Structure formats: C-alpha cells, structure tokens
Amino acid sequence: MKQGINFMGNTPDIFKLRRIIIAHFAKVENGVVVQVIVAEQDVIDSGIFGLVWVQTSYNTHGGQHPEGRPLRKNYAGIGYTYDSQRDAFIPPQPFPSWVMSEETCLWSSPVPYPTDVGTAENPKRYSWDEATLAWVEVEMV
C-alpha cells in the first residue's frame, strides 16, 4: 500500500504555492485606452510593460458589478477615455447629440429607445438617425 509523504508540519519551499492574482489592465496614452491585457499586479508594478496601466474590471458596466465591487464605472476598451477626475473609463460618444450620465459614464440618446419592440414572431429593431434626432425602424432581413 502506497503511503503519502509526511513532512511533519514542515513543507519544503518547493511545495509552497504562491497565490497568483491576475487582473485586467488598460494601457492609457494621452487619456485614451490603447490596449487591455490580463496580468499579475506584480508584473504591472515591475514596469516591464511601461508605466501607464490602469486596472479595470471585466464585470463592471455603468458603475454596477454583480458582486457589488464596481471599478472605474466601465470595463475599459480600446478607444475608451480614462478620466482621472472621475476615475472612470468612458466609451466613445456614439453620436454628437448623445449625453453622458455622470452616474454611469455611459451615453444616452436625447430620445429614449422605442418601447414597441414588436413580437417574438415579428420583432422590431431601431437605429439612431442623427440627422433627425430620432429612432428609425430598421427592416429585419
């Protein structure tokens, strides 16, 4: 019968595992996100990838996080702005008429999205028309 090894409470260093904590980080140049990576905090702190990395949370959207730990309003994406005053990642403004919510750092149209979405058999979709500042129904193909 095979028996386990007993180190009598003294685990050799070779068996001691270091807890590895990884996170998402955004590389920010001139206030704009140019890259998002997954790395250990120690690697980011070492400066091997440069100095301007800001942690971002994959599960944060509009200042909400499923576990109640939102980080920087939104998950960073390439082309997003990092606003250090708000400590937030802000997506690009989709249209000039859209307004950003200070609470969520997300953009909203000046006219709410239509509530008439049709039926399961005959759904309706809409697209924003900046020229008329209105939602227009898009033909489903």
Q: PLM features: what roles do these ranges have?
A:
Residues 2-141:
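Interaction-interface detector
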